[in-house]
């Protein structure tokens, strides 16, 4: 049963480690706890915030509402046919560690998620952000999810089309933001798995390891090594991973920028557009390694903003806006934050 805790501190529940508090919080350890918490008379009419690992949120203030702390455990494996192909289905509770799930599936001989290793957070948050890394996104491995529909007052199952996935985007960041609370997610991992190593940085890492025909474990190990070199451990330095999305532009914009900036880093997309490396642009503007009081830009990866303790989310967002404005002034491209800002 979900009990509401008043005046609940959230410092331990966000990876930036910013201090904030919720009017009420409920530890959700089973699907039915969602409905119980939401129908508690004390929560009636209050805004609701769902928190998993807190790795994709910036808390700039106290939250005057109900926070659902998602802790639903459990992993189940099965088989199914999806679009005419055989898949392993892996259903995980929203509170399961994302990296823990990836490590478990790879170790159990269920490849498909290895490119997404070491991304912080929980399973329930993964489809909201359509997390992605090294050439693979959640949408590529998604089967369905079960969520509580706050409008209907019941649990529903949503497939990939329902979720309307986009680049670091989904239904749950738009029209469904205040409607659905994800309880569990089912992934479809191909039985006829083939390694996805087209991402240049991953290919270089595998080549450096003299691995020409990688197994899923090889890709997992390579991704973990790359991420550990580039990204700070949230347990040591407050951060939310990549803070800015890589902007997507049309071919004409990319060509015009390339003429002015020959070193521009960009990646062709299937629809003919280009995804530009926001980290490269931030670095070119001189922000990499810059510290502004207790917040700053990580010295090994310009996409990452950090909080070294004792600072505030307001300071962080001031720095973020300065970076956005400077990049826009120089390149004419607007970069947008990945985390949700409260």
Curated annotation (Swiss-Prot):
GO terms for molecular function: FAD binding; UDP-N-acetylmuramate dehydrogenase activity. Pathway: Cell wall biogenesis; peptidoglycan biosynthesis. Its EC number is 1.3.1.98. It comes from the Bacteria. InterPro entries: FAD-bd_PCMH, FAD-bd_PCMH-like_sf, FAD-bd_PCMH_sub1, FAD-bd_PCMH_sub2, MurB, MurB_C, MurB_C_sf, Oxid_FAD_bind_N. Keywords: Cell cycle, Cell division, Cell shape, Cell wall biogenesis/degradation, Cytoplasm, FAD, Flavoprotein, NADP, Oxidoreductase, Peptidoglycan synthesis. The active site is at 168, 242 (proton donor), 338. Its cofactor is FAD. One of its GO terms (cellular component) is cytosol. It catalyses: UDP-N-acetyl-alpha-D-muramate + NADP(+) = UDP-N-acetyl-3-O-(1-carboxyvinyl)-alpha-D-glucosamine + NADPH + H(+). PROSITE patterns: FAD_PCMH. Its main location: cytoplasm. One of its GO terms (biological process) is regulation of cell shape. It is found in: Cytoplasm. Belongs to the MurB family. Cell wall formation. This is UDP-N-acetylenolpyruvoylglucosamine reductase. The gene is murB.
